[in-house]
Amino acid sequence: MADDQLEGSIKNILEQKSLKWVFVGGKGGVGKTTCSCSLAAQLSKVRGRVLLISTDPAHNISDAFCQKFTKTPTLVEGFTNLFAMEIDSNPSGEGVEMANIEEMLQNAAQNEGGSGNGFAMGKDFLQQFAGGLPGIDEAMSFGEMIKLIDSLDFDVVVFDTAPTGHTLRLLQFPTLLEKVFTKILSLQGMFGPMLNQFGGMFGMGGGSMNEMIEKMTTTLESVKKMNGQFKDPNCTTFVCVCIAEFLSLYETERLIQELTKQGIDTHNIIVNQLLFPDTDESGKITCRKCGSRQAIQSKYLSEIDELYEDFHVVKLPLLESEVRGGPEILKFSERMVHPEKNTNQ
């Protein structure tokens, strides 16, 4: 099977010139930020303008590059075409799930024909939508951010995402917004009188009904484009980062299954923080705990190789020092392109 395995590098991503969106995510504490910064650094060598975006509330890319970033794209020191920015996108809390949104949309459609009941159902739908759906403000901000990125004409965008649960909800935003906006615009006669009242909920401010409809239509066009690109493997891919431990492997499998369900391409896995212990002249590992840890990692590496034989599995070592600053990130990023370097720390 070893002969059939794909190369353990990110060369396939660097060579795919059609890619526009690259997401990097996984369980917390596995080194996602270092990997996303390194991937962005490598992309800056082979692509035009590259943008790195942190959607993680912790915003670690500033610490990684030793440079403060804001919600405005800023040139990364030491690079000529790599920019970075941090946005707040935290869809947390309990509320209406996608299944509930589907039911609300269906109810609104069924009552479209009745004048009084239709208006009441429309109002009820918007009230539930405003009060019960967590992250709608973040979803709108995400949509506006995508429009901004498009206007700035970046060749490729790398997302340093938050831990898995947050990221999966974030990736649902385009589909959710497209369904809701499409339904509301199809029922303008029913919702029209209430759009001003609920305009603030959509982050669109005040204005006349016609202005509100125009803004919503424009946003819907951007959301449809974004949704189509996210589900196009020529435009979008997701890089999963994990470590060789049970919980991380379990969450990686859950993430891959959910990405497949959402129609988002993923064919790269980065296994980070691997031990390559020192040995004596006879080849015996000199550190007993290091040997035990390596044995555990080897077990899960074998499972990863078996489960994901159709993935590019990049295996990165645990280093003796932190990877911080542009030069160190660039140096570390070479390990993602040249696997042969990873047996030497």
From Swiss-Prot:
Question: What protein name applies here?
Answer: ATPase asna-1
- Where does this one sit in the cell? Cytoplasm; Endoplasmic reticulum
Transmembrane stretches in the record are none
**Organism, as annotated:** Caenorhabditis briggsae
Q: Name one Pfam family in it.
A: ArsA_ATPase
Q: Point out the gene that encodes the protein.
A: asna-1
Q: How does it assemble?
A: Homodimer.
What GO molecular function terms would the record report?
Answer: ATP binding; ATP hydrolysis activity; metal ion binding
Active-site residues? 56
Q: Could you tell me which cysteines form disulfide bridges?
A: none
Where is it found, in Gene Ontology cellular component terms? Answer: axon; GET complex; neuronal cell body
* Lineage, opening ranks: Eukaryota, Metazoa, Ecdysozoa, Nematoda, Chromadorea
